[in-house]
Amino acid sequence: MAPCSCKSCGTSCAGSCTSCSCGSCSH
């Protein structure tokens, strides 16, 4: 999986993840 990017909140998650929300990422 590609890294998650939460553009609306300006946050990002390094590495692979299954879901991305404002300020947090689930692996």
From Swiss-Prot:
<feature type="binding site">
    <location>
        <position position="9"/>
    </location>
    <ligand>
        <name>Cu(+) 5</name>
    </ligand>
</feature>
<comment type="similarity">
    <text>Belongs to the metallothionein superfamily. Type 8 family.</text>
</comment>
<dbReference type="GO" id="GO:0046872">
    <property type="term" value="F:metal ion binding"/>
</dbReference>
<feature type="binding site">
    <location>
        <position position="25"/>
    </location>
    <ligand>
        <name>Cu(+) 1</name>
    </ligand>
</feature>
<feature type="binding site">
    <location>
        <position position="4"/>
    </location>
    <ligand>
        <name>Cu(+) 1</name>
    </ligand>
</feature>
<feature type="binding site">
    <location>
        <position position="6"/>
    </location>
    <ligand>
        <name>Cu(+) 2</name>
    </ligand>
</feature>
<feature type="binding site">
    <location>
        <position position="20"/>
    </location>
    <ligand>
        <name>Cu(+) 6</name>
    </ligand>
</feature>
<feature type="binding site">
    <location>
        <position position="6"/>
    </location>
    <ligand>
        <name>Cu(+) 3</name>
    </ligand>
</feature>
<feature type="binding site">
    <location>
        <position position="22"/>
    </location>
    <ligand>
        <name>Cu(+) 3</name>
    </ligand>
</feature>
<feature type="binding site">
    <location>
        <position position="22"/>
    </location>
    <ligand>
        <name>Cu(+) 4</name>
    </ligand>
</feature>
<keyword id="KW-0479">Metal-binding</keyword>
<feature type="binding site">
    <location>
        <position position="9"/>
    </location>
    <ligand>
        <name>Cu(+) 4</name>
    </ligand>
</feature>
<keyword id="KW-0186">Copper</keyword>
<keyword id="KW-0480">Metal-thiolate cluster</keyword>
<protein>
    <recommendedName>
        <fullName>Metallothionein-like protein CAP5</fullName>
    </recommendedName>
</protein>
<feature type="compositionally biased region" description="Low complexity">
    <location>
        <begin position="1"/>
        <end position="18"/>
    </location>
</feature>
<feature type="binding site">
    <location>
        <position position="13"/>
    </location>
    <ligand>
        <name>Cu(+) 6</name>
    </ligand>
</feature>
<feature type="binding site">
    <location>
        <position position="25"/>
    </location>
    <ligand>
        <name>Cu(+) 2</name>
    </ligand>
</feature>
<feature type="binding site">
    <location>
        <position position="20"/>
    </location>
    <ligand>
        <name>Cu(+) 5</name>
    </ligand>
</feature>
<feature type="region of interest" description="Disordered">
    <location>
        <begin position="1"/>
        <end position="27"/>
    </location>
</feature>
